[in-house]
């Protein structure tokens, strides 16, 4: 079964899955208090329990190796902001082209990636991190020191066939370009979700 087929799941968690996910998120929250200041688990949990479709998306982030964690709270909207916080680009989302156009270009050449970042993110109900969000993420830890992650590409770059990705090397954040049809075993994507 390819990765895209795996994503065509019912977008609802069983009570057992919901409890397991909440336990995982609570443990991660407690173990990474340095990522956020002034947030309380009880308020976050109440918000999560009221948004079952968002729990499903968080579960998809978790299931594919993203280790989602809350990184901020938008005081204007009241939303909590989650990013994939796995040390390396999520394992269940690697070997993907940037978007469907890139994937189709590869497949015409007889090469079959695991899918594409844009469609996978949409199916999961998340957004790719922007370059700015990626840089914010890197302020709370060292991520992608051995891998890289596609980031949301500006339309003017994408129109010309390119896409951008980022990583951390030599204690610096690098943003690079590549053709959208490219895919690698060490490149995936990181998502963001507002709850």
Place the predicted regions along the sequence by residue.
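A binding-site-centric feature that preferentially detects glycan-recognition modules on secreted/surface proteins
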Residues: 2-127, 131-195
């Amino acid at each position: 079964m390819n990765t895209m087929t795996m994503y065509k799941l019912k977008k609802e968690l069983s009570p057992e899955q919901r409890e397991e996910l909440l336990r995982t998120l609570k443990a991660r929250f407690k173990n990474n208090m340095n990522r956020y200041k002034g947030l309380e688990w009880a308020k976050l949990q109440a918000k999560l329990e009221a948004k079952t479709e968002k729990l499903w998306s968080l579960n998809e982030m978790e299931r594919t190796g993203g280790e989602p964690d809350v990184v901020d709270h938008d005081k204007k909207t009241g939303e909590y902001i989650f990013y994939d916080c796995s040390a390396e680009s999520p394992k269940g989302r690697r070997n993907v082209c940037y978007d469907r156009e890139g994937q189709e270009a590869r497949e015409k050449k007889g090469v079959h990636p695991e899918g594409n970042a844009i469609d996978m993110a949409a199916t999961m109900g998340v957004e790719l991190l922007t370059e700015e969000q990626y840089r914010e993420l890197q302020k709370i830890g060292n991520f992608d020191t051995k891998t890289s992650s596609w980031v949301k590409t500006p339309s003017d770059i994408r129109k010309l066939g390119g896409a951008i990705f980022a990583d951390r090397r030599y204690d610096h954040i690098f943003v690079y370009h590549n053709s959208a049809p490219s895919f690698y075993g060490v490149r995936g994507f990181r998502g963001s979700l507002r709850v």
